[in-house]
From Swiss-Prot:
This is Putative zinc-binding protein ORF11. Keywords: Metal-binding, Zinc, Zinc-finger. It comes from Ictalurid herpesvirus 1 (strain Auburn) (IcHV-1). The keyword Zinc applies. One of its GO terms (molecular function) is zinc ion binding.
């Protein structure tokens, strides 16, 4: 049995997670280089090896986990050039012929986007409602983003990542695909186009709950500098992943660091029907 060290729910010692000995469909050879716990049974397995059923207990057959071929098809697309800095060019070939992106790349891009989506928001409400995408994950409201209609059309073409009609909701595992594709294709304009308006959640614990799905080893380790207020702390966590020069992501919290205590006054609400959860959810 192999084990990894995963980030605990709170600052403290690492928690060992025992993995299945072999995942034959993935280059990881059983080592969950980018673990996922998206199964309802809470077992953890490699993000790139996500089977249709949990390899530990067989659950998930009814609602289907994301087949690994979708992930291979997604990561096979080339990254944009130079602005990616040190994250460009780290690729591995999976044994079944699919490209398997080096985990550091996925961790950086998915994590940063997940944080932006988690805290929040829609900055341009004029003319944007028809392009707003309400994002849900694990049955809970996670926020909303305003997408240019061409980008929205691109994401719809991913085959279910976003529903083309109605509320345009990304549900469950497709959320990860949507976020990943968004960053890969628009990484150097994302922060300018979708700056964060206000914290979506009123506590750091709510943010950790979402980030725990990515299981970054040591992500909430004891060496983390402390800031007063939620926005400052989130900005600090993001910089731990994207500080290297030339990464291509401007700091999305730059204009809002002086509002660090805003969530204490508003409870995370922004007054926008797109950034605040609808009643009944």
């Amino acid at each position: 049995m192999r084990c990894i060290r995963a980030a605990p729910a709170d600052d403290g010692p690492y928690t060992p997670i025992i993995m299945s000995p072999v995942f034959p469909c993935c280059f990881c050879q059983g080592e969950a280089v980018f673990p996922s716990n998206r199964a309802s049974c809470k077992h953890v397995f490699c993000f790139f090896c996500t089977p249709r059923e949990c390899p530990e207990c067989g659950s998930g057959g009814g609602r289907k986990l994301i087949p690994n071929e979708y992930l291979y098809a997604l990561t096979a697309k080339p990254f944009p050039p130079a602005p990616m800095g040190r994250t460009a060019g780290f690729w591995l070939m999976g044994p079944n012929g699919g490209w398997h992106v080096e985990p550091r790349v996925v961790v950086l891009e998915d994590l940063l986007t997940a944080v932006i989506i988690t805290v929040g928001a829609l900055v341009e409400t004029r003319g944007a409602p028809e392009g707003a995408v309400r994002v849900r994950a694990r049955g809970k409201w996670e926020g909303a983003i305003a997408l240019p209609l061409p980008l929205l059309d691109d994401l719809v073409e991913l085959g279910g990542a976003i529903e083309a009609a109605g509320g345009k909701v990304a549900v469950g595992g497709f959320l990860v695909r949507t976020l990943y594709e968004l960053v890969v294709r628009y990484h150097d304009t994302l922060a300018k186009t979708f700056p964060v308006m206000a914290p979506r959640f009123g506590s750091l614990g709510a943010l950790k709950e979402l980030l725990s799905r990515f299981r970054i080893p040591g992500y909430f380790g004891s060496g983390t500098p402390r800031y007063d207020g939620l926005l400052g702390h989130i900005a600090c966590e993001i910089r731990k992943c994207c500080d290297p020069p030339g990464i291509g992501f401007p700091n999305p919290f730059r204009a809002f660091l002086n509002r660090k205590n805003r969530h204490k006054r508003t409870g995370g609400a922004t007054g926008s029907p797109f950034t605040d959860p609808p009643t009944g959810h």
